[in-house]
Regions:
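Bacterial Sec-dependent N-terminal signal peptides
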Residues: 1-26
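Charged, low-complexity intrinsically disordered terminal segments
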Residues: 18-246
């Protein structure tokens, strides 16, 4: 029996599913769609599901501490709270160690949450050597491209470890919210060939928004072959804000 982890990175939604196909043939709706769209399935991956905010942030922060070359982050929003502050503190330490740090966030996602990053927050972050860029700034009084925002949640560390899932950067994924209670969401850590696709998605958006030309082999290192006993197949479907048809 073949298992494919089918990940959609959408500007409108995030969906993750485990698909257990009875027969792994082109008759499978999933395989047919992937083939039709020319979306590759990578087989050399190890996946760890992170079933709570606490699991996600403990795992993410630990891997950031071990980063050697670069850390790339792309989120709908970084809520200006204790988790985000701890994250930026840690990222600033890594900058001092010589690690490149780049972060993208959606302008509407930032504006629409109740603890946004304001101009003075962004200046303080940049003053610490962290490159942070706003995707598609809002043009008041209009909310431009309201249905085509960047809802991705991606982290790539040294081109080898990737994170994606349902959680932005906010402390309520751990503490809950007064009117809602405990927050239930999930995330995942990926090691393997699929990380190259997450990296490509991030760098395409980064270069588009900054007019930089970040790229090259150092961001796409060779990935060791994993034992068949732990290797998972992953397909990543990306919907680019303002570009990909519905």
């Amino acid at each position: 029996m073949r298992r494919i982890l089918f990940i959609i990175l959408s500007s409108a939604l995030f969906f993750i599913g485990n698909i257990h196909a009875q027969v792994a043939t082109s008759d499978s709706l999933v395989m047919h769609y992937l083939q039709q769209q020319g979306i590759p399935v990578t087989a050399n991956n190890e996946v760890k599901l992170l079933m709570s905010g606490r699991e996600k942030f403990l795992d993410l922060f630990e891997e950031i501490r071990h980063a050697k070359h670069h850390i790339h982050l792309e989120y709908f929003n970084f809520r200006n709270d204790s988790i985000a502050n701890a994250l930026f503190d840690l990222l600033a330490v890594k900058v001092q160690e010589g690690v490149e740090v780049r972060a993208l966030f959606d302008a509407f996602g930032n504006w629409s949450n109740n603890k946004p990053l304001k101009k003075h927050h962004l200046k303080a972050i940049r003053d610490r050597g962290i490159e942070i860029v706003k995707f598609d700034p809002i043009t008041f009084p209009w909310i431009n491209h309201a249905m085509h925002r960047d809802h991705r949640k991606i982290v790539v560390i040294d081109g080898k470890i990737g994170y994606t899932g349902g959680m932005n950067i906010a402390d309520y994924y751990i503490t809950g919210r007064p009117k809602i209670g405990q927050w239930h969401d999930m995330h995942m850590r990926i090691e393997g060939d699929a990380v190259r696709y997450l990296q490509g998605i991030f760098l395409t958006m980064w270069n588009q928004e900054t007019k930089q030309h970040v790229g090259g082999p150092v961001y796409f290192p060779d990935i060791p072959q994993l034992p068949d006993s732990i290797a998972e197949e992953i397909a990543i479907v990306d919907r680019t804000p303002r570009e990909t048809p519905r």
